Every structure is written in structure tokens, then in C-alpha cells.
């Protein structure tokens, strides 16, 4: 048996695992110390009341023969998929529920989605970046082109027409810089991707943190993106689902490469590789998109943003 030799090209350990091990060792050596954890973006507030209520209802459903649910649809419950599509409609993005795929979170999807692209692809990653982008492509054996996203370009790179790529990662608001891509910046990347026959993987995990009306929450607010983009989103930061695990992926029906529908390819992938996100989790996730759920999660997000401002000010005082 020949193993996947690409694993030997990975760093010794995943960044956040390494940070966790160092944190554990430090706290064991300094039991009285209090650390502000600024590694992996975990949350500290509990799930909002609307979600908790739905989770309780789902548990009760599972206790009775008439309301018990077994395997869920591999691509997600139709009701939740429709609810998420309606959420996009509020931003002027029209989606069919069949273009929405419920997942167990963005991290899983960011790795699994590479199944659609075959081997030895050229991938653009804007640095600094979420480490999983790099590691997933190293494992897949892809060629990675790192492009800087720093002060010199306002943390928002523009396409280089001399570089040909198959896959482009865009995260907005960006992890870790916080930079956002305005409509003009996204349009430039969409035009580039369509010209190059490339695919944009748009990571929208932090879209709920956007407050400005003129900043796109979704790449599909750029109409031409339907022929070149896949959007991956998570409820981890939106609604504190880091330990509950739920997200969603949007693949338009117009997205074709090599004569094949990537939407239908993903249906085939999910029906092979998953048995669906659990009934309990999807029931809880449905509450996030209700009027009350939206109000409650926004309250939590404001607390996190306030804490971020305090942390930033404290760091500046010590520079």
C-alpha cells in the first residue's frame, strides 16, 4: 500500500492544535495565570434562547415514535434549505433551495469541496489566511500560489491577469485581518474567475459581522458570480455553533465546468460521503434565521465586537 505522500509536505502539526498544546503546557506551569485565547476563533457565549428552545423541542421529538427522525436528507432538510434561501433573498440574492446544502460546518466543507476539482490544480490563497486552506490543498497535492494581503494593498488584493489559477480562496470579512471586500473588489475577482474559467471559494463565515449596508455579505450579490463561485458559510461565528456544528454551502445551478454541473456533482458527493446533519442540529439551526433568533445573535455579535475593540486598544497601548 502506498500512502498519500503529500502528508509529508505538511507542517509537523496544525496551527491551532500546536497553539492548544502550548497553552496547556503554560497553564500547567502557571496555574494562577489567566490567558486570553486568541488562537482558534472559539466563542464564549452560550447559544441564544431561540436556538436552545428548538433544540429542546427536537430532543422531545426524538423521544416519541410519532415524531422521531432517523437519517436526514444528505443535502439538508428541505425546510431549512428553503429558510436559508429566504435569508439570502433579503440581500437580493435569489436562490433555489436545491442550491443550498446544509453541512456540519465550514471546516469540513472547505476540505471536502476540493473533491470537485480533480488533481494537481493551481490554487490562489491570500495571506495571511485560515490555515485549513493551505493544509487541505497540500494534502490534495495542489500547487499553491500565495498572494500578499497586507498594508501595501489595503489587505484586499486585486487579480493579477498574468497568473492563471483554477481555484481562488476569498474570505470576507477576512480571517484573520478583518478586511472586507467591497462590491468593486469582488466584481474584479468575479470577472477574473470567469475569464480564467476558475472557481472562487468564498468563505462567508463572518458575514454576520458586517454592519455597512453597501458591503456585500455574499459573493452572489455580484450576479456574474453564479457562473464562477461557491459560497461556504458557518453558524459557528454567526450563532455560536462551534460546539454544535452546522453550516451551509451554496452552489448555483449555472455553475458548470467541463460540461459538468458542480451542483449535481456535489449532490452526488454528499449522497456518497454523508448521511446528513442530525435532526437535532438542523432544528436548532432553523431558529437562527427567525426574527427572534436574528435579534438574539446580533446581541451576541455586538459583545464580541466590543471585546475585540477593547483587545485592539490594549495591544496598541503596549506597542
Predicted region positions:
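Proline-centered loop/turn at the N-terminus of a beta-strand
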Residues: 34, 122, 143, 166, ...
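N-terminal small-domain helix-loop-helix segment of the aminotransferase-like
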Residues: 2-105, 112, 288-291
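Conserved core of the PLP fold type I
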Residues: 66-191, 207-222
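A non-catalytic, amphipathic alpha-helix used as a structural packing/dimerization or gating element
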Residues: 18, 79, 83, 261, ...
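Conserved core segment of the aminotransferase class I/II
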Residues: 55, 221-302
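Helix C-cap/helix->beta junction micro-motif
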Residues: 30, 140, 195-196
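Residue-level detector of conserved catalytic or cofactor/ligand-binding positions
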Residues: 310-319
Amino acid at each position: 500500500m502506498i500512502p498519500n505522500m503529500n502528508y509529508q509536505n505538511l507542517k509537523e502539526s496544525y496551527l491551532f492544535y500546536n497553539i492548544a498544546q502550548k497553552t496547556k503546557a503554560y497553564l500547567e506551569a502557571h496555574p494562577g495565570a489567566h490567558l486570553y485565547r486568541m488562537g482558534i476563533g472559539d466563542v464564549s457565549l452560550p447559544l441564544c434562547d431561540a436556538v436552545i428552545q428548538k433544540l429542546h423541542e427536537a430532543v422531545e421529538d426524538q423521544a416519541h415514535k410519532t415524531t422521531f427522525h432517523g437519517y436526514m436528507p444528505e443535502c439538508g432538510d428541505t425546510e431549512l434549505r428553503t429558510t436559508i434561501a429566504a435569508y439570502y433573498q433579503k440581500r437580493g440574492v435569489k436562490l433555489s433551495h436545491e442550491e443550498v446544502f446544509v453541512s456540519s460546518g465550514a471546516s469540513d466543507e472547505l476540505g471536502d469541496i476540493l473533491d470537485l476539482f480533480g488533481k494537481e490544480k493551481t490554487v490562489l490563497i491570500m495571506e495571511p489566511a485560515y490555515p485549513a486552506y493551505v493544509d487541505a490543498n497540500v494534502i490534495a497535492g495542489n500547487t499553491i500560489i500565495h498572494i500578499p494581503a497586507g498594508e501595501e494593498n489595503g489587505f484586499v488584493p486585486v487579480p493579477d491577469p498574468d497568473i492563471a489559477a483554477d481555484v481562488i480562496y476569498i474570505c470576507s470579512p477576512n480571517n484573520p485581518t478583518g478586511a472586507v471586500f467591497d462590491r468593486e473588489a469582488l466584481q474584479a475577482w468575479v470577472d477574473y474567475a470567469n475569464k480564467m474559467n476558475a472557481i472562487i471559494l468564498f468563505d462567508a463565515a463572518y458575514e454576520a459581522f458586517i454592519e455597512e449596508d453597501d458591503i456585500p455579505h455574499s459573493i452572489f450579490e455580484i450576479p456574474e458570480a453564479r457562473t464562477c463561485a461557491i459560497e461556504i458559510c458557518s453558524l459557528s461565528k454567526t450563532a455560536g455553533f462551534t460546539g454544535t456544528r452546522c453550516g451551509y454551502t451554496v452552489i448555483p445551478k449555472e455553475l458548470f465546468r467541463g460540461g459538468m454541473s458542480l451542483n449535481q456533482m456535489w449532490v452526488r458527493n454528499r449522497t456518497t460521503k454523508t448521511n446528513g446533519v442530525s435532526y437535532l442540529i438542523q432544528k436548532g439551526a432553523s431558529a437562527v434565521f427567525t426574527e427572534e433568533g436574528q435579534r438574539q445573535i446580533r446581541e451576541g455579535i455586538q459583545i464580541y465586537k466590543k471585546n475585540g475593540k477593547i483587545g485592539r486598544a490594549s495591544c496598541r497601548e503596549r506597542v
